[in-house]
């Protein structure tokens, strides 16, 4: 799972993989659909972080993600059934803390695969994101290894974390009481926190030193964006 080529070559190969995989698994699509979706797939391959699986010098599978959402997962039809897709999903769950994915309802193999990986249906739409009549299932991981919890008790119990981001306790006291506070738990341990005031400003965000550089800050921001999406236009 490494990059051996320049980005343009990687994108071209991933688009090829997408088309080969779709032709093998999406029998509900017509030829015009593949032509329609190809530019969108190329755009996603260009802009999203990609995890690549190589066999020798050849890319045979890839996963694209955006924050904590798995946006793409495609495996060369010749390499299906070898556990490559499972490996990519497990990496995404563990290393980028992925928790959501959208899948075509008519792609029964994919629906069953994600169910085995621990995802469950959160909602359904009759059309896809382009308005085409292909129902989409939006899935969420049932038991992710980490979770965000809103603090309803003593917020100062997490002062050691708050002071990592804002070393002046008097300053923390100015905003803490009237703000929302959340803690990030991993395996039963609090490893991070975030404080958001009544105007939607993030006043404090911290992750324990031993968990820094592991995308937990991104996870917190992704959670906050979802939590406040109907209340604030931006944070």
Would you name each region that the model predicts?
Residues 1-16, 145-158:
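A short beta-loop-alpha structural element at the N-terminal edge
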Residues 3, 70, 136, 148, ...:
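Hydrophobic residues on conserved beta-strands that form the core of alpha/beta folds
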Residues 16-42, 150-178:
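Conserved GNAT-fold acetyl-CoA-binding loop/helix
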Residues 52, 58-74, 183, 189-206:
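Conserved beta-strand in the GNAT
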Residues 69-80, 103-104, 205-212:
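A short, internal acetyl-CoA/4′-phosphopantetheine-binding micro-motif in the GNAT/acyltransferase core
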Residues 81-94, 112, 116, 213-227:
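Conserved acetyl-CoA-binding loop-helix of GNAT-fold acetyltransferases
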Residues 94-106, 228-235:
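Conserved GNAT acetyl-CoA-binding A-motif
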Residues 100, 104-111, 116-117, 123-147, ...:
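C-terminal "cap" of GNAT-fold acetyltransferases
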């Amino acid at each position: 799972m490494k990059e051996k080529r320049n980005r343009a070559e990687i994108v071209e190969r991933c688009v090829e993989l997408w088309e080969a995989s779709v032709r093998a698994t999406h029998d509900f699509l017509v030829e015009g659909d593949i032509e329609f979706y190809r530019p969108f797939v190329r755009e996603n391959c260009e802009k999203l972080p990609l995890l690549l699986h190589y066999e020798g010098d050849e890319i045979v599978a890839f996963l694209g993600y955006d924050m904590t959402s798995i946006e793409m997962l495609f495996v060369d039809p010749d390499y299906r059934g070898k556990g490559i897709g499972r490996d990519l999903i497990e990496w995404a769950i563990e290393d980028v803390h992925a928790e959501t994915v959208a899948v075509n309802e008519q792609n029964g193999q994919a629906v069953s695969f994600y169910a085995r990986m621990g995802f469950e249906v959160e909602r359904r739409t009759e059309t896809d994101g382009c308005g085409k009549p292909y129902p989409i299932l939006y899935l969420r991981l049932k038991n992710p290894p980490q979770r965000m919890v809103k603090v309803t008790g003593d917020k100062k119990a997490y002062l050691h974390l708050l002071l990592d981001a804002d070393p002046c306790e008097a300053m923390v006291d100015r905003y803490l009481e009237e703000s929302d506070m959340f803690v990030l738990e991993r395996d039963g341990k609090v490893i991070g926190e975030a404080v958001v005031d009544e105007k939607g400003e993030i006043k404090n965000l911290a992750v324990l030193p031993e968990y820094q550089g592991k995308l937990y800050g991104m996870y917190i921001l992704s959670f906050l964006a979802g939590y406040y999406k109907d209340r604030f236009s931006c944070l």
